[in-house]
Amino acid sequence: GCDAITKLKKLEVMGEYTFPEGYKPEIQVIVNPDEKTLKFIDNGIGMTADEVEKYITQIAFSGATQFLEKYKDKTTEDDMIGHFGLGFYSAFMVADEVQIDTLSYKEGAKPVHWASEGGTEYEMQEGNKTTVGTEITLYLNEDSLEFANEYRAREVLERYCSFMPVEIFLSKANAEPEYDTIDEDDVLDTDTVVEHITEEPKEGEEGEPKKKAKIVRRPVSISDTHPLWTKNPSECTKDDYIDFYRKVFMDYKEPLFWIHLNMDYPFNLKGILYFP
């Protein structure tokens, strides 16, 4: 999902694609314990039928590598993850069946539905997806049903995806997503505004008439897309470093000291060395 969105961003920068109005890159992870499924939805570059045939049904063909080779004079491999064309097949370690629904960004592209129960056999036909991006559904095997549990899924995502360059949102099917309440001064176009109506005074009681108050809610992202080490050291305070240390290493103590690395020559290096 991250690679798919990164590719679309690079195409937009190169002038080969225009984001639709209000576009917000994100990955949705939806657990469904009733149906024993785990779903991943991105609004990235998507795939055509030919691309599904090449990158999904054939092992060791990397879409990221092919993309970088095609645009090697126009872009770099920054933020690209996949290189070997093998990662997708790890899905069959936890799933009896995998389904893909995808729609390419290319003009005139048709949606594609792909399904496989492992092995060498698969089904591919025209799908019904209407938005650009890819949706992958894992039908979990009996040994992996724990991943349909919202809390277990959150634990795994926080461990391995906390600093992905794209916002990742986790939700449970047919349940209310997790929200943060946002100050009205910090409202974004993508936030949800809820009008809250206070109760009227009961008959015979004194009180103010009912009022409307706006409550602004924003979905809670699992990933921190701008972690502390990517910032300039001059922008970071002592409390920032301590809070980040406690969050990442789950240590209530303060580190003895730290070194913020921010090098551009002779090579690019960013990071924070903590000494507990």
Model-predicted regions and their roles:
Residues M80, V98-E121, N141-L145, Y151-P276:
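GHKL/Bergerat-fold ATPase module in large chromosome/replication-associated machines
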Residues G1-E142, E146-F147, S162, D180, ...:
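GHKL (Bergerat-fold) ATPase N-terminal catalytic module, capturing the glycine-rich phosphate-binding loop
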